[in-house]
Structure formats: structure tokens, C-alpha cells
Swiss-Prot record:
One of its GO terms (biological process) is methylation. It comes from Homo sapiens. Keywords: Methyltransferase, S-adenosyl-L-methionine, Transferase. The gene is FAM86C1P. It is an enzyme of class 2 (transferase). The keyword Ribonucleoprotein does not apply. This is Putative protein FAM86C1P. Pfam families: FAM86.
């Protein structure tokens, strides 16, 4: 191939590379130029050059993508999951009970859990609604520690107290 034809082939190849890497639509490629170049070239050196460049790379892109897909599908997924909810819950109280508050809305494995911000209801109250808020907004207890409440539903009759620093 003459130097001028080689330079033209390189420009055509560069044009295809740029359009491909820019994710252009196939109709924007210069197909007529490629067809004309292949017809004009007696021994199809452009096509041979493309094939040689393709054969020089020993792996196909599709093979690599397939291997990554297999690795992704074979990876073991964790069975643990976390969900966050913003709830409004009502805490049932006996008239002798002296606390109420707001609970955080974090629900692990079907139970309600959150940080309690203690407040004091009216002595005559038998039920007091408490709004849930994200744990980052829950207040500190009077002793400076956060109180973690674990209950089975949104109307707790019992709670397990755990202290967090």
C-alpha cells in the first residue's frame, strides 16, 4: 500500500475509533468511506490490518465480560439486610407509668428498635403518642447515655433496656 493510502486508512480507522469510543449511533459511522476503501484496495490491506489488530489481542471483550458476569453471579450474597423506616407509634401506658417518649424507627428482623428520648407525660394520661425519628436525632437520657428499646411491635408491653455509650 502506498504511503498516501496508508495514511488514509489510518485516518479512517481513527475516525471509527473516535466514534465508537464516543458511543455514537452506528448510522453516524462513515460506512460509505469504508466500503469505498475496501473496494479500491486490491488486496484488502485495510481489512487485513483490522484482522491482525484484532488477532493481536488474545482475548475477546465478550469473553472478559462473560467471566465477570459469572464471577458476579457466583458470588455469595449476604443474608443480612437492614431497612430504615420513619414511623409514628403509640406507647400504651398505665396511669401509674411515668415515662413516654419518641422511638427511633429502625426495624431489624421484624421488631421495632430505636433510641428512646424520655419525656414525662401528664399523670392522668393512659396513652401517649410518640413520634419516631431517625436515631441520629434521638436525644440523650438524663444520665447522658442513649437508651436502646427493643420491642416486638409498635404497641410495646415490655421492653429490654440496653445501654450504649
Amino acid at each position: 500500500m502506498a504511503p498516501e493510502e496508508n495514511a488514509g486508512s489510518e485516518l479512517l480507522l481513527q475516525s471509527f475509533k473516535r466514534r465508537f469510543l464516543a458511543a455514537r449511533a452506528l448510522r453516524s459511522f462513515r460506512w460509505q468511506s469504508l466500503e469505498a476503501k475496501l473496494r479500491d484496495s486490491s488486496d484488502s490491506e485495510l481489512l487485513r490490518d483490522i484482522l491482525q489488530k484484532h488477532e493481536a489481542v488474545h482475548t475477546e471483550p465478550l469473553d472478559e465480560l462473560y467471566e465477570v458476569l459469572v464471577e458476579t453471579l457466583m458470588a455469595k450474597e449476604s443474608t443480612q439486610g437492614h431497612r430504615s423506616y420513619l414511623l409514628t407509634c403509640c406507647i400504651a401506658q398505665k396511669p401509674s407509668c411515668r415515662w413516654s417518649g419518641s422511638c427511633g424507627g429502625w426495624l431489624p428482623a421484624g421488631s421495632t428498635s430505636g433510641l428512646l428520648n424520655s419525656t414525662w407525660p401528664l399523670p392522668s394520661a393512659t396513652q401517649r403518642c410518640a413520634s419516631c425519628s431517625p436515631p441520629s436525632y434521638a436525644g440523650l437520657g438524663s444520665d447522658g447515655k442513649r437508651k436502646l428499646i427493643m420491642t416486638r411491635n409498635c404497641f410495646p408491653t415490655e421492653s429490654t433496656w440496653r445501654w450504649q455509650s
